[in-house]
């Protein structure tokens, strides 16, 4: 395993220069990153042709984080609509495990992030979210992606983690999903990673987090785990247009709905069952290190796992697998 390196991400800087130091740190690997991203886009050539004809799609007024995407586009030598579609592709390829586990009087938060994209391990980074010279939150992400899928807020002590969900609405080809996501983006629905970023960087209190995660229109169905170290954690099951379920117990979430065994994406059922078995074996004298090591075994950590993060008693532990 490899330690995750954190970089300062200053929101007070012009959006077009926020990523400069981070890209500079990876200057010797940018060509490699571009090659991987181009290969990732190849199966979506049809989507790219459609997007290239949608002039309004790259209108700065329609694009959140336009300045950042503009800079990333220039550094990678790619077209802007290619970078934009990458933001959407990531939302329909991630399989993850998130869990909130009672350990005595405390809670442990577990998160693994799984993608069938081995190259992401070399480009996974942490960001210290800075505003007014103060660290207001953190996220684990990768170069080229401007949303947050795993992030935590310091002021209000909560963490948000997103898991991919394959709802009835999303039982269609990947091309159809992407085109649908493009349509929703143009009509200003929220990419879920952008929604999480909005909550974290604007230091929204938990009441706003509950409202946003349950009420806003999203471009993709998902599961949203909100871990509150000193309060009531919860998991929201979302379709694009509505909340399907919200629960405050049994907080183990993989990539199938609570109480169901299908779709069994990347050992979703086995991951859930394994975490349940670990919870059942917890003793009052178990150490955090031992518990984390026990949790981070197959199938929770598997061939597609990119990184993991655990939070316990105010400390955050994380590594690239």
Curated annotation (Swiss-Prot):
GO biological process, any: fatty acid metabolic process
Any matching Pfam family: NAAA-beta
Entry-linked Gene3D superfamilies: Penicillin V Acylase, Chain A
GO terms for MF: fatty acid amide hydrolase activity
InterPro entries recorded: Acid_ceramidase-like, Acid_ceramidase_N
Coiled-coil intervals, chain numbering: none
PANTHER family cross-referenced by the UniProt entry: ACID AMIDASE, N-ACYLETHANOLAMINE-HYDROLYZING ACID AMIDASE
Protein name: Uncharacterized protein R632
């Amino acid at each position: 395993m490899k330690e995750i390196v954190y970089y300062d991400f200053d929101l007070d800087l012009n959006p077009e220069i926020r990523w400069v130091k981070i890209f500079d740190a990876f200057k010797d690997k940018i060509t490699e990153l571009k090659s991987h991203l181009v290969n990732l886009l190849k199966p979506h050539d049809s989507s790219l042709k459609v997007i290239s004809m949608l002039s309004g799609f790259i209108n700065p007024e329609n694009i959140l984080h336009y300045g950042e995407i503009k800079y990333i586009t220039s550094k990678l030598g790619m077209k802007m609509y290619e970078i934009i579609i990458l933001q959407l592709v990531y939302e329909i390829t991630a399989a993850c495990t998130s869990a909130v586990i009672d350990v005595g009087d405390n809670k442990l938060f577990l998160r693994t992030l799984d993608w069938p994209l081995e190259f992401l391990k070399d480009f996974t980074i942490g960001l210290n979210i800075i505003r007014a010279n103060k660290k207001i939150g953190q996220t684990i992400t990768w170069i080229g992606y401007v949303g947050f899928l795993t992030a935590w807020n310091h002021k209000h002590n909560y963490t948000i983690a997103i898991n991919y969900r394959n709802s009835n609405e999303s039982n269609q080809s990947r091309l159809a999903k992407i085109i649908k996501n493009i349509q929703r983006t143009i009509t200003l629905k929220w990419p879920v990673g952008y929604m999480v970023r909005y909550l974290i960087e604007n230091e929204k209190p938990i009441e706003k987090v509950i409202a946003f995660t349950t009420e806003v229109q999203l471009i993709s169905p998902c599961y949203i785990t909100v871990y509150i170290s000193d309060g009531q954690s919860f998991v929201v099951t979302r379709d694009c247009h509505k909340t399907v379920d919200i629960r405050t117990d049994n907080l183990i979430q993989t990539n199938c709905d609570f109480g169901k065994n299908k779709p069994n994406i990347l050992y979703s059922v086995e991951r859930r069952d394994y975490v349940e078995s670990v919870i059942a074996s917890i003793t009052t004298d178990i150490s955090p290190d031992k518990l984390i090591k026990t949790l981070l075994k197959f199938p929770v950590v598997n061939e597609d796992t990119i990184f993991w993060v655990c939070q316990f008693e105010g400390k955050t532990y994380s590594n690239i697998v």
